[in-house]
Amino acid sequence: MELQTKSPTTQNDFSQHTPMMRQYLRIKAEYPDLLVFYRMGDFYELFYDDAKKAAKLLNITLTARGQSAGHAIPMAGVPYHAVENYLTKLVRLGESVVICEQIGDPATSKGPVAREVTRIITPGTVSDEALLDEHRDNTLMVIHQEKDRFGIATLDITSGRFLIQEIISENALFAEIERIRPAELLISEENSVHPLKADSIKRRPPWEFDHATALTLLCQQFQTKSLDGFGITHLPLAITAAGCLLQYVNYTQKSALPHIHSIQAEQNEEALFIDANTRRNLELITNLQGEEVHSLAWLLDHTATPMGSRLLRRWINRPLRDQILLQQRQNAVSTLLEKRNYSEIYENLRHIGDLERIVARIALRSARPRDLMQLRQALGVLPTLHQQLTNLPLNKQLQEIKNNLGLFDELFRLLKKAIIENPPIVIRDGGVIADGYDAPLDELRNMSTNSHQFLIDLEQQERERTKINTVKVGYNRIHGYYIEISRAQAKQAPTEYIRRQTLKNVERYITPELKIFEDKVLSSRSRALAREKELYEQLLDTLIEKLIPLQQCASAIANLDVLNTLAERADTLNFNAPQFCDYPIIKIEAGRHPIVENVMTDPFMPNDTHLDEKRRMLIITGPNMGGKSTYMRQTALITLLAYIGSFVPAKNAQLGPIDRIFTRIGAADDLASGRSTFMVEMTETAAILHNATEESLVLMDEVGRGTSTFDGLSLAYACASYLATKLKAFALFATHYFELTALASTLQAVKNVHLDAVEHEEKIIFLHALREGPANKSYGLQVAQLAGIPRSVIQHARQKLEELENPVISETQQPQQNELFLPIENPVLTQLDKLNPDNLTPKQALDILYQLIQLRQQK
């Protein structure tokens, strides 16, 4: 039978269905674009297009249930106990899911069991531990656009971190999207910008982007009369975006959001600007293949807690310009390093767990018993951490951490008394609240647990009373308690025995006494479970009262974890403290690329970098594979590490104010946008030339290589000149165009350096050492030989190279390409320069004229 494809949408369509399906269709009509997981007994079922989509995405069986208009209704389902695994996969695919639970009792319901939507799971609003990456912020972002200005609001619901900002260019907008990498991005249906760097993009109706509504919603959320106290009233577009975000979160969570109690404006000038291209080229969070291995985060992340890991990535992604704050971080790292106690602090932090997200789940009332167990363990560690910090000479950063850690002795004792040592995963079946915590619960539990002895006594009593030696008293979940007698002795059953079940070899009965006992025991179990759930909710109420100090504690622990990790990394990787200056300088002694050094088996060759007011650009020449790109990247990474408060891989480093880091390294076709390699290269170069300043660090590698030699050389020359003379940015400019080295003779701030190499027996040996002056050879053929180019091809290339380097002009051969920017020799003019017309006869003059015409024709 053919499967129905679309869900019915009208009441007339509904009338053809069973009451249960009508209930489903009414709920589905409210969420037409989301997958509805509809609870039916031990399964969550999906129907119609939802079933087809889920079957494909989850690789589950597509079947059918009933009919609609003569067609079978498509159906797919997953077991309720395994639903988290399926939800995880859907969320990672960018899907949103509606969870519809049974809230009624099937045994007492007349008609369909009552059901309601209990939560909506979207990629940017999930809080369940199983659905989250513990190393990555799970951010919901909203963008509101008016003309060329953008308001941005972001919320990580798993921490309550609520931030807004305004941006005035698409380039800066895309840089922010690349930095934040939102799990879900909301934009207006009228928005002209279509950013692609988000796992899930949704368009919202324009009426959700209303400024007046946003003000009302935000004031209600923060329980204030105005937003003046938050210092954000000068950001109307961002406030509008925040209002849309809050509407969406309220829609999905269907619960209060007490952990979202503040909003903060991010100022662009507070941080180094790093565009999307530079983030990828420097491999800050992921490598060029999109994996974390061999990225800067991979190297640095030896944190003990998930929240510390996430904070470290935020620091890497947003280096600060405030040198005072950076010096405070650096001082804290120095203290932890000098006292050599980072290992002990690490061991204590390891027992904390993901306190930040546990607190958020408590606020959302979705915390599970093991969340409370982990919270109890974390609170138990705090006194030891306090003592460890007390033993240190505290600078401002460490003192703030100690103050915000807090001591929660009362909460710790409460959780110690209330929750058993190893609780089950969920509260649903009870067994979470410890004995002795609540007298009414203990009484109900005793009634249930002591039933076993009552049954033993009843069985012995009935055997003696009836003289039937096969009498047994038992229980099963379907029929409850019963008295069992063998079929052979069933005729001896007393008259007060009421037959309950007949099996092959036995008869089962119930008595009035046993029925009374059954009602009492079963009701005690259900009442005990209800009481336990009530006590659990009371615990959550108590914890929510301490929400703000618990959030402050989680933040303090994350900061301590990152600083402690930076101390360990500095010690292990031989990093040293950089020095900040208030004048223009980047002076690095024996700098190293931290990641390349870490993965190399051979010793890494350190190199110096010196840029200052009179030395703003280095033209870097040298062979391919000589280390030019590594050298440039290490300079940028050392700068960036200093600007997150870390020590750096160098013997010494002096760094002045830096506002931006740009890179133009490598390029590939952007076929999706119809852009060639050269177009991509020029677009990136244009962004740098439009946005770099005197305080920017610019890395330019092989500009102009994607076009003809003359075009490429001309562009590279002009770009380098513009950077050096107009922008006056700090620049490392790597090139194979040897003609660019001439800039150093005309521009005082430009210097030539090269990565050294030597040739031995037609083989190249890379020294990777930076030397002053230009390279004298490119060693292209030797590198090609290393790459495995056939020997015959190398020999042919060598012959051609000799011809090009030593051109011979003949009557039949065109002259070789002239050097750019040098005067071109003209044979006609050369001959004219040799003539003295006063010494020529008319015949000689005529002959020479014919020779000149011939030379001109050859030219």
From Swiss-Prot:
Q: Which CDD domains match?
A: ABC_MutS1 (cd03284)
Q: Which keywords accompany this UniProt record? A: ATP-binding, DNA damage, DNA repair, DNA-binding, Nucleotide-binding
Q: Where ATP is bound, by residue?
A: 622-629
**Which Pfam families does the UniProt record give?**
MutS_I, MutS_II, MutS_III, MutS_IV, MutS_V
What InterPro entries is this protein classified in? Answer: DNA_mismatch_repair_MutS, DNA_mismatch_repair_MutS-lik_N, DNA_mismatch_repair_MutS/MSH, DNA_mismatch_repair_MutS_C, DNA_mismatch_repair_MutS_clamp, DNA_mismatch_repair_MutS_core, DNA_mismatch_repair_MutS_N, DNA_mismatch_repair_MutS_sf
| GO MF, any single term | ATP binding
Please give the coiled-coil regions recorded for this protein.
none
An example GO biological process term is:
mismatch repair
Similarity remark: Belongs to the DNA mismatch repair MutS family.
Q: Which protein is depicted?
A: DNA mismatch repair protein MutS
Give the originating organism.
Answer: Coxiella burnetii (strain RSA 493 / Nine Mile phase I)
